[in-house]
């Protein structure tokens, strides 16, 4: 499971997600990708479940890149504990995702295989996503 090796502070405030992604919103490695359409938190287990679903479907062919990393700790107090007495202990890690962020990329497979693999990954995630395809810049020879 993905998580940071070490962090400066064990606990973080929740924060809020404003605006669209300004970085990581284009395909950089693969031919096809999965782009977030709404904001949210994606846990390390959800990322791993999506990765397993994709890699099992594409079998030996192709390569998968995970473009997000869960670096935010989420704390939880034990069940049936009275209010107060401090913040709970870190339970799991999440990646904060803004709309427009590319979550996964795939290369080395056909478009149909990539579409199906990313569709399987979509169902493992708590946010709406869309399929992305690398657009080749068509060269019109305009020499003026």
UniProtKB/Swiss-Prot annotation:
Keywords: Ribonucleoprotein, Ribosomal protein, RNA-binding, rRNA-binding, tRNA-binding. GO terms for cellular component: cytosolic large ribosomal subunit. GO terms for molecular function: rRNA binding; structural constituent of ribosome; tRNA binding. SUPFAM superfamilies: Ribosomal protein L16p/L10e. This is Large ribosomal subunit protein uL16. Binds 23S rRNA and is also seen to make contacts with the A and possibly P site tRNAs. The gene is rplP. It comes from the Bacteria. Part of the 50S ribosomal subunit. The keyword Transcription does not apply. Belongs to the universal ribosomal protein uL16 family. GO terms for biological process: translation. NCBIfam families: rplP_bact (TIGR01164).
């Amino acid at each position: 499971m993905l998580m940071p090796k070490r962090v400066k502070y064990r606990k973080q405030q929740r924060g809020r997600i404003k605006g669209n992604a300004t970085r990581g919103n284009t395909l950089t490695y693969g031919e096809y990708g999965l782009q977030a359409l709404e904001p949210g938190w994606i846990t390390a287990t959800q990322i791993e479940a999506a990765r397993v679903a994709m890699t099992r479907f594409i079998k030996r062919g192709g390569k998968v890149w995970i473009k997000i990393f869960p670096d935010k700790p989420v704390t939880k107090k034990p069940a049936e504990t009275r209010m107060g007495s401090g913040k709970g202990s870190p339970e799991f890690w999440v990646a904060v995702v803004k709309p427009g962020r590319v979550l996964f990329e795939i290369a080395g497979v056909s478009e149909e295989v990539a579409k199906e693999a990313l569709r399987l990954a979509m169902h493992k995630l708590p946010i709406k996503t869309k399929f992305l395809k690398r657009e080749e810049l068509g060269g019109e020879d305009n020499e003026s």
